[in-house]
């Protein structure tokens, strides 16, 4: 290897790195497929397992937790913290997932923020589009599949939304019955919960 200033701890951690710099991989098979990606941090069992840049890209991915970012291959600027956080991401950019199972099924959607256990757990778009969804709270927006530009803050806020978009829900279970609606604003505990 000709890389510089890499820290690799654990069986198979950073195993394929050749000409990559400034990576940290700690845990079994963390960052083990990458050859040329630089400035990544993978901490935990299988964290950033399949990331593989072949062009020497500076990717700035951070994955901390068992299987966090496990399937990420070429995405950049992702922060994934928690067990299974961003587990299915493949070629997605600029995502933040913090919490167990946060943003766990998203493959291509970019510019998504999910904070809380199960937040945006089912989010998954079929193109590499920026969806601008934000969910903060336990299971907030956990059913959103292809909906875009939703802001959901509070435990279970917008938890039934699937394809709806441009909704704003603030408070426990706010907008929790809406599945496909657009342009709704719910403010307060259980606001528009039966809509």
Give a label for each model feature.
Residues 1-195:
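Glycine- and small/polar-enriched repetitive beta-structure motifs of secreted/surface proteins
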């Amino acid at each position: 290897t000709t890389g510089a200033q890499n820290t690799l701890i654990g069986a198979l951690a950073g195993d394929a790195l050749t000409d990559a710099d400034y990576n940290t991989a700690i845990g079994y098979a963390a960052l083990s497929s990458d050859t040329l990606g630089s400035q990544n941090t993978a901490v935990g069992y299988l964290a950033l397992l399949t990331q593989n840049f072949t062009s020497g890209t500076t990717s700035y991915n951070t994955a901390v937790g068992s299987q966090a970012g496990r399937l990420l291959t070429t995405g950049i600027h992702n922060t994934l913290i928690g067990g299974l956080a961003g587990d299915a991401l493949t070629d997605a950019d600029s995502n933040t997932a913090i919490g167990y199972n946060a943003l766990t099924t998203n493959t291509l959607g970019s510019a998504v923020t999910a904070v809380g256990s199960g937040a945006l757990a089912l989010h998954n778009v079929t193109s590499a589009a920026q969806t601008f969804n934000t969910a903060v709270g336990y299971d907030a927006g956990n059913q959103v599949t292809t909906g875009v530009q939703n802001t959901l803050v509070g435990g279970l806020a917008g938890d039934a939304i699937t394809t709806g978009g441009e909704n704003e829900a603030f408070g426990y279970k706010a907008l929790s019955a809406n599945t496909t609606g657009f342009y709704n604003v719910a403010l307060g505990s259980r606001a528009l919960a039966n809509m």
